[in-house]
Amino acid sequence: MRVKIPRWEIAVICSALLFPGTSLSAQEVGQEEKEVKEMRQDVEQLQQDVRQLREEVRRLQEEIHGFRHNSFPQCGADTVAPYVPHHFIHRLGIEARPQYVFPTNPFLQGENERWKPIQSSFAAHLKYSFKFRPNTCADRIYGGAYQGFGLAFTTFGDKKQLGDPMTFYVFQGVRIARFNPRLSLNYEWNFGISAGWKPYDNDYNSYNGAVGSRVNAYLNAGIYLNWSLSRYFDFIIGGDFTHFSNGNTKFPNAGVNTTGAKIGLVYNFNREESDLTKSLVKPYIPRFPRHISYDLVLFGSWRRKGVYVESGKQIASPGSYPVAGFNFAPMYNLNYKLRFGVSLDGVYDGSANVYTEDRIVEYDYDGGSGTSGRRFLVPGIQHQLALGLSGRAEYVMPFFTINVGLGTNVLGRGDLRGLYQVFALKINVTRSSFLHIGYNLQDFQTPNYLMLGLGFRFNNKYPKVRH
């Protein structure tokens, strides 16, 4: 852009050069220089504003071109806008998580080899993630969603009795609220497996009533503040809750629960300065086609069972029992992020209504669970089948869907009566199939069984959202 200087200023400058004796006083010259300097700053600012405006106009032209040809550059089916350098922003983060351990069982309360309560833990995390670029269609729909995988090392200060587990997990986070372009409130969940525990052993670790297996599931959820320090670095601080358990696949299964703080630093490899500014143009979001889809899930797992005896105590069954089932759920797709529906749930639980004889008989089992000398009897299959109805709700995000359900068995005997609750994570494999990892509770407190399986979605009209 050319800078226009008035003719009278040019004449004054020329006269000062040609006729020094008639030049302006030093004070007047200083004032003129100050005005020229301010004018140059104004011109530079104007040039910068014009460049930003041109960039916004170019983005708008790309979107208008997409509307005319039914192909949206940031929100359509086939193309990606040429001005976007990469589809995602790639990130690497580190976190420190000091935690408080809930004293949920006697072992953690102090009934252990050292006769000291286990009250704290510390975890160090290394995480890779990728997120949608700001001011894209996916960013607007899903609230700046990011996802990835992480590796964590956790110590409880008692390696001999509890171990120092390593955890591998997937995670996803979403913006809850944005206070300004650099500061936001986010939530994040983690789900994975942890290995390296020291489980219960009747001979070598008999006090440990919290953990019964070397490998346990890992669940974590928390909220935090994200502050963008610069183009490359983000600082995070917040709190979270963590649960470790084996999903009732082995006894004991009291689990370990912790809560505490999370503090970390995130490096953004390919974030641009423009990603930290508020855009004047917002991408167009196509109207969501409301419809009914149908989810069919087939699952299976195994479980241990605690059986009450005549003394009123509960003892562990001598082995594991198979579990298999299905869910068929018509789901009403309300918008990009919510589904509601009703599910028909069938299950075969090989541990249902298992009982022991009142008398003690010869039974050779050495599992360290107090089951020696008792015979566990399995009833007929009619006592191990159930059919129920549950209400379902789903929170839909890129790559992952969180499913919750509340239902009751309309057909079932004994142990299979009553309310049940379902919590599941669906991981997209293709547009019409997904992995299903879930858990079933009874009456909001009693652990039931894992639900590991494969799902299929029919009549899926969910729009393809480009990133």
Segments from the language model and where they lie:
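Transmembrane beta-strands of outer-membrane beta-barrel pores
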Residues: 96-102, 130, 151-157, 191-199, ...
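Gram-negative (and chloroplast) outer-membrane scaffold detector with strong preference
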Residues: 142-195, 329, 334-410, 427-429, ...
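Surface-exposed strand-loop-strand hairpins of Gram-negative outer-membrane beta-barrel proteins
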Residues: 101-123, 161-162, 304-327
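Repeated loop/turn-to-beta-strand initiation elements of outer-membrane beta-barrel proteins
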Residues: 102, 135-137, 227, 231-235, ...
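Residues on the lipid-exposed face of transmembrane beta-strands in outer-membrane beta-barrel proteins
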Residues: 94, 124-130, 170-176, 189-193, ...
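Outer-envelope beta-barrel architecture signal
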Residues: 86-92, 141-147, 181-187, 231-235, ...
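Residues that define the transmembrane beta-barrel architecture of outer-membrane proteins
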Residues: 88, 118-124, 162-168, 183, ...
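Outer-membrane beta-barrel "beta-signal"
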Residues: 257-278, 447-467
